[in-house]
Amino acid sequence: MKHVKAVIFDWAGTVVDYGSLAPMGAFVETFGQFGVPITIDEARGPMGMAKRPHIAALMALPRVAQAWTDKYGHAPDDADIDAVYDVFVPKNIAVAASYSSVIPGVADVASALRGDDIRIGTTTGYTREIMAEIVPGAAAQGFSPDSIVCTGDTAEGRPSPYMIYRTLPELGVWRAKEAIKVDDTEVGIEEGINGGTWTVGVSVSGNAFGMAEGDVKALAPDEFAWRRNAAIQKLQAAGAHYVIDSVADLMPVVYDIEARLARGERP
């Protein structure tokens, strides 16, 4: 392909772990261990951020902050955030491999991209320790990117563009407009926008929908429709140039962006 040079994927909810389920149980279990229960919906709110800022965002929620204050006699501070993070990470590592199934269609799309000489990068809110549990299984299922940039590899995570800026040179791409960021979270879409790439939101397979594949298929058509529309609206509100149900639907978008670049358009 002449104009599109790279596609940069998120991991959980985008290429693996349909519904982005792996971190949810770990967050809920961790806060419960500290005597401050949180809900799945609360846990999902900051999804896409690095995990320590994610925990900080959860602890800044008024209800959670008040519950913490009631439990410990003071508002949550940096030491508390560190304590929760230190308990969370081993839990997330322990479950990560169990949620490394590649989402249907991803391997075929990766093959199609490579057939068009498009390089494949990835960024993630996961640490390298967590990714070490995921990458081998994903590779065995047909998804093995050219670049992986993790939380901790750059000075800041999402929504800053630093992981994009690190990924592009690793892929040999220097014009951000020639890259596409694909992500299932609002903060991941913002990462792409801030980095100057095209952005594609993933609505059904990821965090914005937040359900396992089997549960999605079991939904009544009207419930599926309103949940899908709500997910689309979230991603569009974050600034996504396109929204697709899953990565399986990506190639027509890539061809459309190729045509737009050929006409001189920019993200």
Curated annotation (Swiss-Prot):
Q: Which residues bind Mg(2+)?
A: 10, 12, 184
The EC number(s) given in the record are: 3.11.1.1
Does the record's keyword annotation contain Glycosyltransferase?
Answer: no
Q: Which domain of life is it from?
A: Bacteria
Q: Name one GO cellular component term.
A: cytosol
The UniProt keyword set, sorted, is:
Hydrolase, Magnesium, Metal-binding, Schiff base
Q: Which reaction does it catalyse?
A: phosphonoacetaldehyde + H2O = acetaldehyde + phosphate + H(+)
One GO term in the molecular function aspect is: magnesium ion binding
Which HAMAP family does UniProt cross-reference here?
PhnX
Q: Which protein is depicted?
A: Phosphonoacetaldehyde hydrolase
Q: What organism, scientifically named, is this protein from?
A: Paraburkholderia xenovorans (strain LB400)
Q: What is the lineage of its organism?
A: Bacteria, Pseudomonadati, Pseudomonadota, Betaproteobacteria, Burkholderiales
